[in-house]
Amino acid sequence: MRASSEASLKAAADRWEPVLAEAGESARDLAESIFAVVDALDSSASLRRALTDPARPADAKASLTQGLLGAKAPDAVVDLVAGMSRSRWSADDDLASALEEIGTTSLLAAAESRGELERVEDELFRLGRSLIGARELRIALSNRELPVENRVALVDALLEGKVAPETELLVRRAATSMRERSVPNAIAHVGELAAARRRRLVAAVTAAVPLTQGQLTRLGEILERAYGRSVQINVGIDPEVVGGLRVQVGAEVVDATVLTKLEEARRRLAG
């Protein structure tokens, strides 16, 4: 993807994270709905163009999305796709690729909510390694001329009951969506997403009033410097929160005073 599509994907993924946090294990259902949208986009060049045409008004693209999906998908997924159709995409197939990644992230979030993310990451790594030495299986899974249902049956025969359900679904997608040049490459990419998600920290922020994008960006920078890792910020609103802001990272509660001191210390060091 080019820079504009990457920026649109990141913005959509950031907006989607609070939905995943609230969904818990149900994020798996959201993922499957997103994948259904991806399949529809992949099968219709005219639909891809209609939802990504930069000359078409953003509101018109969002209305088209809402009309097409309507009651066919959860409200959260309709809102996600409508919002993404408003964004700028460098190529008409980038929207589908971005949704594929968000669907994948949703499955990983479902595994994470069950405490199984590390297991899924490990299973993906092991499977990718085993495919390197299994030429016939690798070719069969990557064969675009083989009907999709045959590739799904092959994955099920290989993995059903032996791995986490999210792992099996992710490998199914790798074998059917064929966005990467080969299934091992697709599995490796998903494994990288799983590893990145497992390494990140999540900050649950409760604010007395909604934070501006600038405030969120600054807060994220302060927390990332403090913890030395990427921090995902999920925001909730409570008018009665003490001090106007409450931040919890893991089991640690960080109040507004501590954040102020961290920022002041950073400025002194920078100066």
From Swiss-Prot:
Belongs to the ATPase delta chain family. F(1)F(0) ATP synthase produces ATP from ADP in the presence of a proton or sodium gradient. F-type ATPases consist of two structural domains, F(1) containing the extramembraneous catalytic core and F(0) containing the membrane proton channel, linked together by a central stalk and a peripheral stalk. During catalysis, ATP synthesis in the catalytic domain of F(1) is coupled via a rotary mechanism of the central stalk subunits to proton translocation. This protein is part of the stalk that links CF(0) to CF(1). It either transmits conformational changes from CF(0) to CF(1) or is implicated in proton conduction. Coiled coil: none annotated. This is ATP synthase subunit delta. One of its GO terms (molecular function) is proton-transporting ATP synthase activity, rotational mechanism. The keyword Transport applies. F-type ATPases have 2 components, F(1) - the catalytic core - and F(0) - the membrane proton channel. F(1) has five subunits: alpha(3), beta(3), gamma(1), delta(1), epsilon(1). F(0) has three main subunits: a(1), b(2) and c(10-14). The alpha and beta chains form an alternating ring which encloses part of the gamma chain. F(1) is attached to F(0) by a central stalk formed by the gamma and epsilon chains, while a peripheral stalk is formed by the delta and b chains. It comes from Beutenbergia cavernae (strain ATCC BAA-8 / DSM 12333 / CCUG 43141 / JCM 11478 / NBRC 16432 / NCIMB 13614 / HKI 0122).
